[in-house]
Amino acid sequence: MDIGLREWLIVIGLIVIAGILFDGWRRMRGGKGKLKFKLDRSFANLPDDDGDSAELLGPARVVEHREPSFDEQDLPSVSARETKERKGGKRQEEPRQGDLDLDEGLALEADPSDAAEPVEPRKGKSKGRKEKEREKAPAVAAEPAPVDEVLIINVIARDESGFKGPALLQNILESGLRFGDMDIFHRHESMAGNGEILFSMANAVKPGTFDLDDIDNFSTRAVSFFLGLPGPRHPKQAFDVMVAAARKLAHELNGELKDEQRSVLTAQTIEHYRQRIIDHERRSLMQKR
């Protein structure tokens, strides 16, 4: 069979292509082998002291080896093993220095039972102190000062539907009242709800409380602001804050201010309330004398 020039060129081209593919495949395999070899050499450079997992802490030893760079002697001779041995020596010496217990972790490693013993009496003492404070606290709370007078300002809704819960809640929160004891709202010295109670606000409709869980469906025809005497340290200032909160509620939610007799609250009635506060303070001073 005669083979022409065309057939020879095809055969030679196939051989060249096969050679190129084989050479590329060989180089790729050779490259992978070199990469693995380099990785293995990087791990082979680690110290051969121990075969434990602690040897993986190479970065920590490098940092510790650089820290003594301020020393003037034996910098090249410092090795990771020597620094580790020095640290181990310090850990063995510290528990022997006495009952200082400067390091709680070292004390636990030396003897866990000894370290647990001094902790228990401290807890017992703290519990005993807390129990004593709790015993004293109810004794103080169980003897509230008797209230001689109560100043009341009622806010009655003009709309038959009354004050809606969400709008009422938003209004009184802006005035600094916070939900608290007896399921009613209280105004403290701080707007955040801290300090003594200046005055309170209750629901004027039975049962006289508020249900925050159902505030979206809540409504009432009237609310009552009240301030007891004796009460806050500065009753006149507290009364002014109460009047401002009641006026804000009546103005924004279409309410009407009433006194304790459900009569219209006039400027003269407010001055009468202030005079009652002054008279009460005067009587209190007379009794103290």
UniProtKB/Swiss-Prot annotation:
InterPro entries listed in its UniProt record: Cell_div_ZipA, ZipA_FtsZ-bd_C, ZipA_FtsZ-bd_C_sf
Biased amino acid composition, Acidic residues: 100-114
Residue intervals on the Periplasmic side: 1
Any Pfam family matching the protein: ZipA_C
Record flagged with keyword Cell division: yes
Disordered: annotated segments: 65-141
Highest rank taxon of the organism: Bacteria
Topological domains, Cytoplasmic: 23-289
Protein's GO biological process: division septum assembly; FtsZ-dependent cytokinesis
Protein topology in the membrane: Single-pass type I membrane protein
Entry-linked Gene3D superfamilies: ZipA, C-terminal FtsZ-binding domain
Primary location class: membrane
Family: Belongs to the ZipA family.
Role played: Essential cell division protein that stabilizes the FtsZ protofilaments by cross-linking them and that serves as a cytoplasmic membrane anchor for the Z ring. Also required for the recruitment to the septal ring of downstream cell division proteins.
Subunit and interaction comment: Interacts with FtsZ via their C-terminal domains.
Name of the protein: Cell division protein ZipA
